[in-house]
Amino acid sequence: SDQGDVAEPKMHKTAPPFDFEAIPEEYLDDES
């Protein structure tokens, strides 16, 4: 819900912490 999103940091909502050294295969598969 929007209320929950507002409570969370905007950075976290806009772009979650991306560890390129530990990116899930799902993300890589989606990007391909």
Curated annotation (Swiss-Prot):
Keywords: Glycoprotein, Protease inhibitor, Secreted, Serine protease inhibitor
Organism: Amblyomma variegatum
Name the record gives this protein: Variegin
Region spans: Contains the active site: 8-14
Note: Variegin-derived synthetic peptides show antithrombotic effects in zebrafish larvae venous thrombosis model.
Carbohydrate-modified residues: T14
Quaternary organization: Interacts with human F2 (thrombin); the interaction results in thrombin inhibition.
Lineage of origin: Eukaryota, Metazoa, Ecdysozoa, Arthropoda, Chelicerata
Statement: the UniProt record of this protein carries the keyword Glycoprotein: yes
GO cellular component: extracellular region
Localization of this protein: Secreted
